[in-house]
Amino acid sequence: MIGKAHLGPIPQTDTRAGYIAQQPAIDRAISRVLEGGSYILGREVESFEAAFADFVGVAHAIGCASGTDAIELALRACKIGSGDLVFTVSHTAVATVAAIERVGATAVLIDVEPGTYTMAPHELSRALQVPRTGRPAAVLPVHLYGQPAELSTLCDLARANGLRLIEDCAQSHGALYRGRPTGSFGDIGCFSFYPTKNLGALGDGGMVVASSLALAGALREMREYGWRERYVSACVGINSRLDSIQAAILEVKLGSLAADNARRSAIADRYDSGLAALPLTLPKRRADATHVFHQYVIRLAQRDALRDWLHAAGIGTGIHYPVPVHLQPAYRGRLAAGPSGLGVTERAARQILSLPIYPQLSEDMIDRIITEIRGFFSRFR
């Protein structure tokens, strides 16, 4: 520790700072909703849905209660359930796999690429050639840390095998793959608005996006008990509605998302430059994609020691994620994997560390973080 803890803590993420940055506009939006008296769905949600659909470049956006529900609704709308296989990754938030199991389907876990930590297309290709009990139904890649997965190859594999492609975009708001937004490639894109996301609510929220009118209609029904008309269920659905206050807040914040993502990218550039000479692995950026740096993740063998060092200096870090889904107690020993196993995933979980990154991170804060990391290596080299 260089001795700068007295300067005040630097959190790994700071949702309050994001609110303060837009407080007048957010407060006005909240007041408008409160005074209007409509708090579930309604005009505010419809307005945000239209704005978000335009942002992603799709015809339809349907608000829901969370990113987890977004994946569940997507699977249900695609008629995926018991006896079906969904190919996804273990290096993800558990919500990805939990949603698959909530519809009764079975997750088949594919290893990730060592540089991007997104689904490895060659591993998916091998897994699709292995005979299995159950019907292969969908590929569900995760655009992790703000980095798009290798969508061209994944889309080709899904199409060639007659599978749905459902994108987990919980961490990739505004990320581009070959110039197109994530969420616009698959049958359905699934977004989370958890407060720490690049586009975060002041509570929970989610969104499913689709270009198919039929899928959009099914999603709208299923998010509200399967209602086609009030109190009459045309299909089995769930209760997963985006509330009006969160929609109003999110529409305000959507207006600054491009600038916020640009700031995240600038912070990542500073880290890249300041840490380049050190014996650690920096994030890899796809040449044909735009990374929006939901997380800035470094990798090193001394991960835990560096984390302790930064904590002592008042600098917060995270591990995304410390235990792969297939090794967590609730799932250990009962999830299938691709033929090569999950070695890349398991090694990454032991070595990755997420540094502070959010739009309000100041240049002085960035300097301090870089200085502390350099100090760690000077001390222990």
Residue ranges and their predicted role:
Residues 10, 84-85, 163-164:
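Hydrophobic "anchor" residues on beta-strands that sit immediately upstream
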Residues 84, 90-92, 111, 169, ...:
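Nucleotide-sugar donor-binding loop of glycosyltransferases
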Residues 103, 160-161, 313:
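Helix C-cap/helix->beta junction micro-motif
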Residues 37-85, 91, 99-103, 109-111, ...:
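Phosphate-binding glycine-rich loop
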Residues 1-38, 43, 313, 356:
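N-terminal "arm"/small-domain region of PLP-dependent enzymes with the aminotransferase-like
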Residues 115-201, 209, 354:
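Active-site phosphate-binding strand-loop segment of PLP-dependent enzymes
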Residues 2-3, 16, 45-50, 55-61, ...:
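PLP-dependent aminotransferase class I/II
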Residues 106-116, 318:
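Short beta-strand->loop structural element characteristic of the AMP-binding/adenylate-forming
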